[in-house]
A protein has these predicted regions:
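Outer-membrane beta-barrel proteins and related beta-barrel translocases across Gram-negative bacteria
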Residues: 197-210, 215-261, 267-268, 273-274, ...
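Classical Sec-dependent N-terminal signal peptides that target proteins to the secretory pathway
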Residues: 2-28
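A generic signature of intrinsically disordered, low-complexity regions enriched in glycine/proline
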Residues: 7-8, 15, 61, 68, ...
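N-terminal amphipathic/hydrophobic interface segments
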Residues: 24-257, 273-281, 286-292, 352, ...
Length: 834
């Protein structure tokens, strides 16, 4: 009885002790687990088979297994651990933690992920979390991503949740991790302190690698890592900024003792760089400013700027001064252009460029641009004061006006409906040649410095037809003032496919114009063409045949024009053409041989207009063309003719670029065609023999030869010989052209030679000599050094022709291009080499 009482008392004491101990545990953690083990007299608890433990501060820990020591107040959790603090808005994921409750410190082992304030994602390992201080720390490589797609890679870090301050070493910052490495910027720092909330930072040993297309090039971003730059590309443009330290506050980033270059990585110094005491980037103004800056060429300072600025790479357009340009000319002297660019609105801008010459000439050039949804307008005008022409005793003002306007009309039922307007006007005939280097906008500058063209043009087309109409005014910049203009107003061209079937295709075209030229010579033409072109059909013997039927209705009237009468005329013309060829092929071990004899029989029962005073070059390439005399607008080639030709080609089976080809062709007719152009070579019953030879069977040689042999086979009236030799880095081309007899009277030889020393250096030489006059027309000698970001060359030019204000000249130019900054060209003083 006494023993039973003792046992009962002992059990009661144990139960009371357990209840007291369990109450203490609950004060620290509230366990919600599937299975629990209690050992060591109730001091140790082990939770099994997944569950959670919630602290008295509301921290909830989920895990597969828990171990809690009541005496030390340390909680261990293992297996798919999740720590969630909904009050302070952070979540941690790992597989192994130790939670020292008395110190409110959590240690993780292995890979650890954290989501802070629902916008900062941490990926690290072996992390220490100080709950009271709200700080995360790790000495392992870590990755941090924010809601703005910025990624921070650090060899170690410390992060204050409350302040949003991230501290670390060997830091790599990626501007937009959602993009691939080709399209994002990269920043590296030795040490740094970053405020993730305000984006302020202070860092040492700064290196900024911009994506390669930052300045318009489409090269890919080279790979960069924290340990070395061994994998960096050595032959691509790689814009970057290095600095001793950097900081950012209130949208202002400052790089101290900075160096900027866009050159690719190499073993030595970059070809060019800008070294500044301070580089400041103002994100509000989108502007980069350099203080006390030196422009270095291969580490040699060549220019000093107390201060200069330019728009940052995000800016497509920003008002401000553009890079000056220096020019030199024997006629105009030395000049400097100082462009100022002004943004009027999102789609409008203005560039004003004053140019100052040391010869008291002044030039002001203005360009206005406007781009709308369906149109684009650009106008460039300039006025020059103080220039004295050799043809005038006075210093007169001269000017130019160039304009271009394109409008998409977006008319229904048309795939394209476009209006184009172009205006070209100068007040001095040699203006385009003399002021060539001073004209800024090359987009609307006339392509031909000997003539101008202004026009208004409409274009419409769909799947089966196209229509063009407009007016045009052309001016040649030589000759008398009265005869230099040509007015074509209006003109039109219409083409359509009427239909097609298994036999061929019907086409219709119509064109017309009024052409006033040579002061009072007027021609008006309305031309309608209907033709049928058959499909190719083959005979059982292997002949390939086709035919064409061409009808033309020509309506004309003229004044002081020999081919048109002064009263309205209407004519109907026709041309019939039959072509046949017999293609043959023979295969050898290494070559394929092709032979194709070809015949064209054509008949025009009517007459053609007189084109004997015009010019037309016939060769083996165009002799089978229906309009081989280029008279299709007004006539068909008159009479009956047979054109016979043959082509032989020998082609390498393994390399189609290695071949030998020869073409021969001639025209035979029943009577002379005196209305054909005098130099055509097909006026007589038996025409010249036209031929061409191409020889490219050898690795290093290419021979191209065109010729025209008179019908008696006595004289070669046309020779055009081109020989190209290429061996490794050496290339030379010789071209000889000779015209005799009916073809013309000229004789010239030209040479172009290039030698590429390596990928960065080459030399070029070009010359042409007129053997008819025994005069050399020009010499060009150029040496160029070029890499991904710098191009420097020396040009020697010598010309022997004279054109009013232009005189024979000898010049040496030195130019250097620093991508993406500017191009500078300077003429070398003649006293230095004469």
């Amino acid at each position: 009885m006494k023993n039973n009482l003792k046992i009962t008392i002992i059990n009661a004491i144990l139960i009371i002790f357990f209840l007291i101990s369990n109450t203490y545990s609950i004060e620290q953690f509230n366990f919600d687990i599937t299975e629990i083990e209690i050992t060591d007299n109730g001091n140790k608890f082990k939770g099994l088979k997944r569950g959670s433990a919630t602290s008295d501060s509301g921290l909830k820990i989920e895990a597969d297994t828990f171990e809690y020591d009541k005496i030390t107040n340390i909680l261990n959790a293992y297996g798919d651990v999740k720590i969630n603090d909904p009050i302070n808005d952070y979540i941690l994921f790992t597989n192994d933690i130790t939670y020292i409750k008395n110190k409110e410190t959590i240690f993780t082992k292995g890979i650890t992920k954290a989501i802070i304030e629902s916008k900062y994602n941490f990926l690290s390992k072996n992390v220490t979390f100080y709950r009271n201080k709200k700080e995360l720390h790790s000495s392992e490589f870590s990755e941090v991503k924010d809601e703005k797609l910025t990624q921070y890679n650090l060899s170690e870090f410390n992060y204050s949740i409350e302040q949003g301050i991230l501290k670390g070493s060997n830091i790599e910052v990626i501007s937009d991790y959602s993009k691939n490495s080709k399209n994002r910027d990269l920043y590296t720092y030795k040490d740094g302190i970053f405020n993730l909330k305000t984006k302020k930072y202070n860092a040492s040993d700064t290196k900024i690698y911009l994506k390669n297309n930052t300045f318009g090039k489409n090269n890919s971003l080279v790979s960069v890592n924290l340990e070395s730059e061994e994998n960096l590309s050595t032959n691509e443009n790689a814009p970057r900024i290095y600095g001793a330290s950097s900081s950012k506050k209130d949208e202002i980033t400052v790089i101290n003792k900075g160096i900027f270059t866009s050159c690719g990585f190499n073993d030595g110094c970059p070809p060019w760089s800008i070294k500044a005491e301070k580089i400041t980037h103002n994100e509000n103004k989108k502007q980069i400013t350099y203080d006390n800056a030196f422009l270095n060429i291969y580490n040699l300072p060549v220019l000093y700027f107390p201060k200069f600025f330019h728009p940052d790479p995000t800016v497509k357009r920003q008002s401000g001064l553009l890079m000056p340009q220096i020019n030199d000319s024997d006629i105009l002297g030395t000049s400097i252009l100082i462009p100022y660019f002004h943004v009027i609105s999102e789609n409008k801008d203005l560039t004003v460029t004053p140019t100052i010459f040391d010869t008291h000439i002044k030039m002001l050039q203005t360009e206005y641009r406007q781009k709308n949804k369906s149109s684009n307008f650009i106008v460039d005008a300039a006025h020059v004061q103080g220039y004295k022409s050799n043809l005038s005793q006075n210093k007169n003002g001269i000017s130019h006006l160039f304009a271009k306007y394109d409008l998409d009309l977006n008319l229904p039922n048309f795939e394209n409906s476009i209006l184009n307007l172009k205006v070209e006007k100068v007040t001095n005939d040699t203006y385009l040649k003399i002021f060539d280097t001073n004209l800024i906008d090359k987009e609307i500058k006339p392509n031909n410095d000997g003539g101008l063209s202004s026009n208004l043009n409409f274009q419409f087309n769909n799947q089966t037809s196209d229509f063009t109409t407009g007016v045009s005014v052309n001016e040649t910049l030589n000759g008398t003032n009265s005869d230099r203009y040509q007015y074509i107003l209006p003109y039109y061209n219409y083409n359509t496919v009427l239909g097609y079937n298994e036999f061929g295709q019907f086409n219709f075209s119509s064109s017309g114009y009024n052409n006033l030229h040579n002061t009072n010579s007027l021609q008006t033409s309305l031309n309608n063409d209907l033709n049928f072109l058959s499909r190719d059909f083959f005979t059982k013997m292997g002949f390939q045949n086709n035919f064409g039927i061409y009808f033309k209705n020509l309506n004309t009237i003229g004044k002081n024009y020999s081919n048109y009468k002064s009263s309205p005329q209407s004519e109907i013309m026709s041309l019939y053409n039959f072509e046949t060829n017999y293609p043959l092929i023979k295969k050898e071990e290494n070559y394929i041989n092709y032979i194709k004899p070809k015949l064209s029989i054509r008949l025009n029962p009517g007459e053609m207009k007189n084109y004997s005073n015009s010019s037309r070059s016939i060769n083996s390439d165009n002799i089978f063309s229906i309009d081989r005399l280029s008279v299709g607008g007004d006539s068909f080639e008159e009479g009956r003719s047979l054109t016979a030709g043959i082509n032989y080609t020998k082609e390498n089976i393994n390399d189609i670029n290695k071949y030998f080809s020869i073409d021969l062709a001639s025209v035979y007719r029943d009577k002379d065609l005196n209305k054909a152009p005098n130099n055509s070579g097909i006026r007589t019953k038996s025409s010249n023999l036209f031929g061409s030879v191409d020889f490219s069977l050898l690795d290093d040689y290419l021979l191209e030869y065109d010729f025209s042999l008179d019908n008696n086979f006595n004289n070669i009236e046309y020779n055009n010989v081109g020989v190209t030799f290429k061996k490794n880095n050496f290339l030379t081309k010789f071209n000889f052209i000779e015209e005799n007899g009916k073809i013309g009277q000229s004789n010239s030889v030209a040479n172009v030679t290039e030698y590429k020393f390596n990928e960065n250096n080459y030399v070029y030489f070009g010359t042409r000599r007129n053997r008819e006059t025994s005069l050399t027309e020009y010499y060009d000698l150029i040496y160029e050094y070029k890499n991904d970001c710098l191009s420097a060359n020396i040009k020697y030019k010598k010309t022997y022709y004279q054109d009013r204000d232009l005189t024979p000249d000898e010049q040496i130019f030195f130019s250097i291009t620093l991508f993406p900054l500017t191009t500078l060209e300077q003429k070398v003083n003649p006293d230095l080499y004469r």
